Structure formats: structure tokens, C-alpha cells
């Protein structure tokens, strides 16, 4: 990207943009919700489309001059439907949280009962956390993982559904490493007369690549972000049955949003086209292969992985046996060039600002070209940093920079 105009007009911001580029180039990104967009996606985000206001939907706008963005938004809609095999797609949500909000507002009334995954067990804020709008407006009942297997206990989900008669069941997670059983969720929803919404924000790219089962055939609504494993711009997407299209669209606009971000919608269209390419399947396969290998390499070095491994792009490391908190590990690894995030683990005893674990994902490093053979070195540096946390870690930082130089970024 050419930032000569920013460099000329605002040197202070330009310098910080360049500083962030160096941070990304010299470090290993293991935050599971992050990825690296293509130059094409980035160019769409910075295009002339940012100048256009376009309240409404294609061919039904409240402003004039929308004939070009109408075409772009329709292309994005059509590509999303093709990519996921959906009957209807809304590409306007500014975020995954707003996608979830729109579905809730479309089918629920304040106080209605909803069944969702507990945040501390791997769910998301918008799945009923009391500090989030979802937990404040609706009566969320939480399910979690089994204490022994650390996997979702579907019989317990069924029991809670029968006891509480939710109007909506929410499946999906932000920190769950196993394949989600969508047919089982559908079966439970049907048994109690509930609607089913799947939040696939973390696994959308894996679903698109065919390496994770699709929730679309089993769900009334599917929400996602476009910037995690899908490798697109920051934004949201909703897929649903055609019979819900009108009420869903009304709850995005004018329900919770005004004008859509047409430059971001264009970038979504580009990312959907990239995900429709056969090479994206290889990418998805490599993400999972790298993740499984990194988990195994850490297990071999004495780390406890929640549920014993992973089936997707993410896993949690329970650090209780390493005598270090998630907060401390996050800062420590950052100092040697590895970026992770602190994360609660099942049956957490510490504050969410401290935590007993870290979350690790391989979507970004796989985009960058890291392969299975690189995982042993990453695991070794993580292990050595934590085991020798009070020593000189400069050699570890050099090892990470050497590894990053093998896989250049935005050169």
C-alpha cells in the first residue's frame, strides 16, 4: 500500500502505521480472532466507496446516486449465498455483535428466554454475558462444557432446554476447539420448539473451505464476522432462511443501523471471491493442520490443552500447572514477539482480567505461509519463555524474528 498522502498530511499517524506494520512483520500473530487481509481486500476498504451514503438496500435506497453501490452490494450478497449455500444474506452488519443483535431483535422480545454458551466456557459476550446488551435485555440461560472432557455436554444442553423452554438457542463460541454438532443442536431446538441461531464468527473460513461442517442446513439464522478465518475486512454477515429475510433486513436497517459501509461491503465481496477459489480449501486445511500440530508440540512440552487438543483453528492453554497467569503469559510472550490473548478456562478461579489461560490460533500465521514444520519452533519458544521467565529472553526474540523473516509479510 502507498501511504504517501498520509505521510505528507499527518506524519504522526503515518509513523504509527509504519510502526504497526513492523510489529506485524517481526512478530508471530497467534490471536485466534485475527488474520491478514490480502492487498485486494485492503484496497477495497480504502476506496472511493467510502464517500457514498446509501441507507436502505439495493434498488430500495433513501438517497440518490446509489446505482453503483447497488451493484457492488448485490455482488456481495450473491457471493455470500454461493459461498455458504444460503437462501438469504445480509452483508450490512458493521460487526458480529451487531449481526447477533439484529437476529435477537428480529425474533425476540425483551425478557424472552435464550440458551447460549457460557462466556467462561468458551462462549461470547453477546451470548448472554450480564455485562453485554444480550444479558441485560434477555433472559439467557447458559450451558457449558463437561468438567471432565471439557467438551460441550449435549445432554446437559437438552436438559436445560427442556427445563427452560427457550425461544432461541444460540450455538457457537469464541474459544472452543472442537467440532460443533449442528444436527444435535437442531434436534434439541426442535424438541422444545425453539429457533436455532449459529454464531460461526470463528469458524466461517473453515466452513467456507469445507474443513468444518456447515451450520447453514440446520439453522434458522447464521451470523458471522468476516475478518477471522474468513480473512476479510472487519464486519459482519447474516445468513438465514428466505422466510426470515424481510424481518431480518428490517432489524438491520432501520432497526439498529443507518447507512451501510459500502467500502467495507466491497471488501467483503472481494474476500468472498477469494474464499470461492479452490486455493482457499488448501488454506483451511493448513490452518487446522498447523493448529493440531502446535497443540501437540505444546502437550509434548508439558502444557495442558483444554479438551486435550483441537479440531479447528484455536485451542486454550490451561496454565495452572505452569504457575503463571494468562495475563503474565500474554505480556511475557509479547516481549519475545509472540502475540496471544489471556483467556478464561473452564472452571476458572481468576478474574477475566487475569485468567488462568491463553488462547492460541493459527489463522494468521497460516495466511503468512507458516507450515506444520514451523510449529515445533514456535512451541519451543513459548515453552522456553515461560520456563525461563526471569532470565534474558533476547535470544528467543531473535529466533522469532528469524522465523518471521522466512515468511515475509506485505513486502
Swiss-Prot record:
Pathway recorded for this protein: One-carbon metabolism; tetrahydrofolate interconversion; Amino-acid biosynthesis; glycine biosynthesis; glycine from L-serine: step 1/1
Marked site (Plays an important role in substrate specificity) residue numbers: 227
Single GO MF descriptor: pyridoxal phosphate binding
Gene3D superfamilies: Aspartate Aminotransferase, domain 1, Type I PLP-dependent aspartate aminotransferase-like (Major domain)
InterPro entries with a match to the protein in the record: PyrdxlP-dep_Trfase (IPR015424), PyrdxlP-dep_Trfase_major (IPR015421), PyrdxlP-dep_Trfase_small (IPR015422), Ser_HO-MeTrfase (IPR001085), Ser_HO-MeTrfase-like (IPR049943), Ser_HO-MeTrfase_PLP_BS (IPR019798), SHMT-like_dom (IPR039429)
Entry keywords, A to Z: Amino-acid biosynthesis, Cytoplasm, One-carbon metabolism, Pyridoxal phosphate, Transferase
Listed GO biological process terms: glycine biosynthetic process from serine; tetrahydrofolate interconversion
A Pfam match: SHMT
EC number: 2.1.2.1
Cofactor(s) required for function per UniProt: pyridoxal 5'-phosphate
GO cellular component, one term: cytosol
Class of enzymatic activity (EC top level): transferase
Sites bearing N6-(pyridoxal phosphate)lysine, chain numbering: 228
Protein localization: Cytoplasm
PROSITE patterns: SHMT
Enzymatic reactions: (6R)-5,10-methylene-5,6,7,8-tetrahydrofolate + glycine + H2O = (6S)-5,6,7,8-tetrahydrofolate + L-serine
Superkingdom per UniProt: Bacteria
Residues that coordinate or bind (6S)-5,6,7,8-tetrahydrofolate: 119, 123-125, 351-353
Family assignment from sequence similarity: Belongs to the SHMT family.
Oligomer and partners: Homodimer.
Function: Catalyzes the reversible interconversion of serine and glycine with tetrahydrofolate (THF) serving as the one-carbon carrier. This reaction serves as the major source of one-carbon groups required for the biosynthesis of purines, thymidylate, methionine, and other important biomolecules. Also exhibits THF-independent aldolase activity toward beta-hydroxyamino acids, producing glycine and aldehydes, via a retro-aldol mechanism.
Protein's name in the database: Serine hydroxymethyltransferase
Lineage, broadest ranks: Bacteria, Bacillati, Bacillota, Clostridia, Eubacteriales
Amino acid at each position: 500500500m502507498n501511504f504517501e498522502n498520509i505521510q505528507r498530511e499527518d506524519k504522526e499517524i503515518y509513523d504509527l502505521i509504519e510502526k504497526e506494520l513492523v510489529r506485524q512483520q517481526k512478530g508471530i500473530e497467534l490471536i485466534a480472532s485475527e488474520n491478514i487481509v490480502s492487498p485486494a481486500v485492503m484496497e477495497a476498504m480504502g476506496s472511493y466507496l467510502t464517500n457514498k451514503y446509501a441507507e436502505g438496500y439495493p434498488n430500495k435506497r433513501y438517497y440518490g446516486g446509489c446505482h453503483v453501490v447497488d451493484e457492488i452490494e448485490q455482488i456481495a450478497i450473491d457471493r455470500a449465498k454461493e459461498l455458504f449455500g444460503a437462501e438469504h444474506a445480509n452483508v450490512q452488519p458493521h460487526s458480529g455483535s451487531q449481526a447477533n443483535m439484529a437476529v435477537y431483535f428480529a425474533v425476540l422480545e425483551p425478557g424472552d428466554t435464550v440458551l447460549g454458551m457460557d462466556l467462561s466456557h468458551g462462549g461470547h459476550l453477546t451470548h448472554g454475558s450480564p455485562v453485554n446488551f444480550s444479558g441485560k435485555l434477555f433472559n439467557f440461560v447458559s450451558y457449558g462444557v463437561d468438567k471432565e472432557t471439557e467438551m460441550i455436554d449435549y445432554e446437559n444442553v437438552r436438559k436445560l432446554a427442556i427445563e427452560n423452554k427457550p425461544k432461541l438457542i444460540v450455538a457457537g463460541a469464541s474459544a472452543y476447539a472442537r467440532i460443533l454438532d449442528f444436527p444435535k443442536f437442531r434436534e434439541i431446538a426442535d424438541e422444545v420448539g425453539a429457533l436455532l441461531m449459529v454464531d460461526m464468527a470463528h469458524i466461517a473460513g473453515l466452513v467456507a473451505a469445507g474443513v468444518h461442517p456447515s451450520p447453514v442446513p440446520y439453522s434458522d439464522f447464521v451470523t458471522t464476522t468476516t475478518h477471522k478465518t474468513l480473512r476479510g475486512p472487519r464486519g459482519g454477515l447474516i445468513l438465514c432462511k428466505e422466510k426470515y429475510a424481510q424481518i431480518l433486513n428490517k432489524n438491520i436497517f432501520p432497526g439498529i443501523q443507518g447507512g451501510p459501509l459500502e467500502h467495507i461491503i466491497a471488501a467483503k465481496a472481494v474476500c468472498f471471491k477469494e474464499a470461492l477459489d479452490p486455493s482457499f480449501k488448501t488454506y483451511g486445511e493448513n490452518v487446522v493442520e498447523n493448529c493440531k500440530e502446535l497443540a501437540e508440540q505444546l502437550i509434548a512440552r508439558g502444557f495442558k490443552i483444554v479438551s486435550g487438543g483441537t479440531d479447528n483453528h484455536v485451542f486454550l492453554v490451561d496454565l495452572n500447572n505452569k504457575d503463571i497467569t494468562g495475563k503474565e503469559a500474554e505480556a511475557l510472550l509479547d516481549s519475545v514477539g509472540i502475540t496471544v490473548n489471556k483467556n478464561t478456562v473452564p472452571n476458572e478461579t481468576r478474574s477475566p482480567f487475569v485468567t488462568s489461560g491463553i488462547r492460541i490460533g493459527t489463522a494468521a500465521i497460516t495466511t503468512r505461509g507458516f507450515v506444520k514444520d514451523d510449529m515445533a519452533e514456535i512451541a519451543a519458544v513459548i515453552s522456553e519463555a515461560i520456563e525461563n521467565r526471569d532470565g534474558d529472553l533476547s535470544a528467543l526474540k531473535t529466533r522469532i524474528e528469524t522465523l518471521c523473516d522466512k515468511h515475509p509479510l506485505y513486502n
